[in-house]
């Protein structure tokens, strides 16, 4: 769990200095088409200015669209691309503080005091970045796992951030329904 320095800086600005209403209204202005080369701090940092009004969202749009698109494209670059590619967005963590090893990290992300803000960030990145990934020769199916594990049912989780057997079943059924 060691994020890149740019990820930390952009998340701090979003959590501490950016109102929810600003995040709700943020749209990407443009896509920075280059993948990063420097510990996640190359072109991703330039992407900060590619979203408005919450400019730091540009960094996360770049990470979850440009970088994932490049990764998946490279991973499937053989002679035959798959017909369909499912790209999943993370589920929301459990909202209950349960004494988990993840409580401290979730607290630093503001999740213990205001889970709606991090949930909004996850949803916006899914809508504006993950849902816009294109892979030549394949149908990309965006999968919002946060629609299944929404953070409200503690029994769906182990340690707040991992699915329990019950949560895993819910995700598996969601994926099966999708395909």
Can you say where each PLM-predicted feature lies in the sequence?
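Oxyanion-hole/transition-state-stabilizing segment in secreted/luminal serine hydrolases
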Residues: 1-59, 91-101
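A short helix->loop->beta-strand "cap" motif at the edges of active sites that frequently abuts
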Residues: 55, 59-62, 66, 76-84
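Catalytic phosphate/metal-binding cores of nucleic-acid and nucleotide-processing enzymes, i.e., regions
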Residues: 74, 145-148, 174
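Loop/turn elements at helix/coil->beta-strand transitions in domains of secreted/extracellular proteins
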Residues: 80-85, 136-140
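Histidine-centered active-site loop/cap adjacent to the catalytic His
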Residues: 155-179
């Amino acid at each position: 769990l060691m994020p890149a320095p740019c990820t930390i800086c952009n998340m701090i600005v979003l959590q501490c200095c950016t109102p929810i209403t600003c995040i709700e209204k943020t749209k990407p202005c443009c896509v920075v088409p280059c993948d990063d080369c420097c510990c996640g701090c190359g072109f991703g940092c330039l992407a900060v200015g590619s979203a408005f009004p919450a400019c730091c969202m540009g960094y996360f749009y770049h990470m979850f669209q440009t970088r994932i698109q490049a990764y998946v494209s490279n991973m499937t670059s053989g002679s035959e691309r798959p017909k369909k590619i499912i790209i999943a967005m993370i589920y929301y963590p459990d909202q209950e503080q349960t004494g988990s090893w993840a409580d401290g990290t979730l607290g630093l992300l503001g999740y213990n005091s205001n889970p709606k803000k991090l949930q909004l960030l996850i949803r916006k990145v899914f809508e504006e970045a993950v849902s816009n990934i294109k892979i030549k020769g394949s149908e990309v199916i965006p999968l919002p796992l946060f629609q299944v594990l929404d953070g409200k049912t503690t029994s769906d989780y182990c340690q707040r951030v991992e699915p329990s057997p019950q949560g895993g079943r819910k995700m598996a059924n969601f994926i099966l329904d999708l395909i």
